[in-house]
């Protein structure tokens, strides 16, 4: 099915197979045109509209195929603006904002002025192939847009894009192969989304109702099982604040081996519950001279400056900056830190709402210390943490599989869309 190409020619866009052509987009498309936005102040242009109206967020929120839009316009709105009907199976291309975002519309649509509708010529250029060519070069188009005065692309620039043009049948085969990979990625994404919904439901049920309870009582944090108690964080955890050693002193940072965790490190975990490394590390000298709080593994780190509420459990002893607080348990016999990490993640919105500050939100040490939390029996804490951790592991495995497929797709795109590897037709 595949073979390695041996015969290449040099072109403006690099080496391509001898039997491929280089063409400008305008020469292989029937139409390349931006849309327009009907006046939002005119109700008749939008009320009970039936024409899907594409904005950039519709493209960024879709995968390869666009099948729906958030907003719809009326015929009157269409006729009183620069919007036009883009036939289905055309290519939509963003010129502003998220430059280079691309989709194929599976329904007839109108677009706003930030989006080009591109209709390829029949029997010359396949929409599916064009989609992948544009997607492959997205970063280049984005940089190109940033070089213009307006920091955007325009229709004239896009019309002059030079693209490789393999024989039509080969275009179809290339698109078919890449579509199969995209379908695999989409299946995994759906599975991840399903698991995340399951986890959300489990967190709500387990962290408020526990496991196997039939008797409940009212409390300051809502209805909880009868044998659960309510305490403030300071009753169960020692709360420590973080700091930043002087960045002007290299002895505090150079060849540092001690984790120095920031809210950014926590935000990069996504849904993971554990953290074992940080982007920047400090030295033992910094630890001694700057009175940094070093807290043991198994402790909780929570971001308390914008963004508030990112939480993780340490897998190694670490220190942290002033955007975080460290919580380590006072009594190991009654606390499972994984349970409380999940509980604090579950209460992220409430913690954000408690945060004060006009410039940026911050959860003070006293606010966190006084925050009320439940205390279930230790074995139940462990069971709840184990269930949620198991779902997290499943999600993480799916994400790793998705990332592997995405890496594979990128390599295959590079080989097929440059003609280094050919598809037999």
Swiss-Prot record:
Oligomeric state and interaction partners are given as: The type I restriction/modification system is composed of three polypeptides R, M and S.
Q: Per the record's keyword annotation, is Protease included, yes or no?
A: no
Name the source's superkingdom: Archaea
Annotated segments matching region Target recognition domain 2: 209-368
What further note is attached to this protein's record? Type I restriction and modification enzymes are complex, multifunctional systems which require ATP, S-adenosyl methionine and Mg(2+) as cofactors and, in addition to their endonucleolytic and methylase activities, are potent DNA-dependent ATPases.
Name the chain's protein: Type I restriction enzyme MjaVII specificity subunit
Q: Which residues form a coiled coil?
A: 169-208, 369-418
Q: Give the start-end ranges of region Target recognition domain 1.
A: 9-168
Q: Which GO terms describe its molecular function?
A: DNA binding
Q: Provide the species name.
A: Methanocaldococcus jannaschii (strain ATCC 43067 / DSM 2661 / JAL-1 / JCM 10045 / NBRC 100440) (Methanococcus jannaschii)
């Amino acid at each position: 099915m595949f073979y390695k190409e041996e015969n290449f020619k040099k072109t403006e866009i690099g080496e391509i197979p001898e039997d491929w052509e280089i063409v400008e987009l305008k020469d292989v498309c029937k139409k390349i045109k931006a849309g327009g936005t009907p006046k939002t102040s005119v109700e008749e242009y939008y009320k009970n509209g039936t024409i899907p109206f594409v904005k950039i967020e519709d493209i960024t929120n879709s995968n390869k195929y666009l099948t729906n839009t958030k907003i719809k316009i009326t015929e009157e709105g269409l006729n009183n603006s620069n919007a036009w009907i883009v036939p289905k199976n055309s290519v939509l291309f963003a010129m502003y904002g998220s430059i280079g975002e691309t989709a194929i519309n599976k329904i007839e649509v109108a677009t706003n002025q930030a989006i080009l509708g591109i209709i390829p010529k029949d029997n010359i250029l396949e929409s599916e192939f064009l989609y992948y060519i544009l997607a492959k070069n997205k970063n280049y188009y984005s940089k190109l847009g940033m070089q213009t005065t307006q920091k955007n692309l325009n229709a004239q620039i896009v019309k002059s894009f030079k693209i490789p043009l393999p024989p039509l049948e080969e275009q179809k085969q290339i698109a078919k192969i890449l579509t199969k990979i995209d379908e695999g990625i989409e299946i995994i994404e759906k599975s991840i989304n399903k698991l995340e919904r399951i986890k959300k439901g489990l967190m709500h049920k387990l962290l408020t109702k526990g496991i196997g309870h039939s008797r409940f009582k009212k409390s300051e944090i809502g209805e909880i099982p009868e044998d659960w108690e309510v305490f403030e964080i300071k009753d169960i955890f020692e709360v420590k604040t973080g700091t930043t050693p002087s960045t002007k002193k290299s002895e505090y940072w150079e060849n540092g081996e001690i984790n120095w965790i920031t809210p950014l490190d926590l935000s990069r975990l996504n849904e993971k519950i554990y953290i074992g490394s940080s982007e920047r590390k400090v030295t033992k000298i910094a630890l001694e001279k700057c009175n940094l709080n070093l807290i043991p593994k198994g402790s909780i780190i929570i971001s308390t400056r914008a963004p508030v509420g990112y939480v993780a459990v340490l897998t190694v002893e670490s220190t942290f900056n002033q955007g975080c607080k460290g919580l380590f348990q006072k009594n190991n016999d009654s606390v499972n830190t994984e349970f409380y990490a999940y509980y604090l993640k579950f209460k992220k919105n409430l913690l954000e709402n408690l945060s004060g500050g006009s410039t940026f939100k911050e959860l003070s040490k006293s606010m966190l210390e006084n925050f009320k939390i439940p205390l279930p029996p230790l074995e139940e804490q462990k069971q709840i943490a184990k269930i949620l951790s198991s779902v997290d592991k499943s999600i993480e495995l799916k994400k790793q599989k998705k990332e592997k497929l995405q890496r594979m797709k990128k390599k295959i795109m590079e080989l097929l869309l440059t003609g280094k590897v050919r598809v037999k037709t």
